């Protein structure tokens, strides 16, 4: 195996964790569109090292701390993002990192939690375009020592079709991640703020599930649909695969046989694919023609929702204790206004998040 020609090593710091990546120049330039704000010009030992090497048939080998995996070249950035989220962010000890957007609204921190596809980036783009201060559309970084919400200036990765919802021309560089995205930078060096509001975004459910029917939705990065035949064989019955009505690489799978998550992941992996997203219900992206639906949350309900989106929960439970984590989160949320929101019309949803 030979290292890819014209490669370069770059060093990145994510709080108390560091990452070295060695990539071809073109891939490194793309990676820096997303994570350039975290790059350091230092020659220091890294927590994790990733090296990209040439293979055959247009594929490459990614070596992550001595563990290798062969992937398609166009999937390198997807795998790198997976490494960052599951091995770097998950190991951060100085901050609590949530899968959430973070805004600074008049000096007050707003954390907007929700799974991928619920509109965190769309809402954040609308907030930034209208003159608001977006600290992150993807990671809300909480400093428990200072009790402050800090900025996480990874650039926003925006679907080109999203620009039709905001008063903004799509003039940004493109990058192919799970799908083609426009890369919109965030301001660096933003001030930390106290957390005053927590919003948990929820799905609008689509099709009902028939009695005895198993349904799931998956987002798969794969060269073909071989994983579908592998999944049908693995569950021992016919599985109906329909392109999700929202598109974006998602499939809706229905079967009269149970579809265990591990069986699904195995079928995708052995077929050379990569599981990006997974739901157990028939869900739809936000409908921007309807009004948002708001539901006040008790502190207990807010704590449950917030903990489910904490990327480094295991690290905090191991380093401190589950009781410490629960107590700290409960204390923080007890002074914040917490509510659930099924997003609707964009400007209206943005406004209620700011003012409700």
What spans do the regions from the language model cover?
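Short polybasic amphipathic segments
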Residues: 9-11, 58-64, 141
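Conserved lysine of the Walker
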Residues: 120
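Post-Walker A alpha-helix
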Residues: 123-124
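A short, compositionally biased
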Residues: 4-8, 54-59, 97-99
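Glycine-rich, often acidic-flanked micro-motifs
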Residues: 2-10, 16-30, 101-114, 129-236, ...
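N-terminal "assembly arms/tails" that initiate or stabilize quaternary assembly
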Residues: 33-40
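Charged, amphipathic alpha-helical linker segments immediately N-terminal to NTP-binding catalytic cores
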Residues: 42-87
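Pre-Walker A adenine-sensing motif
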Residues: 90-105
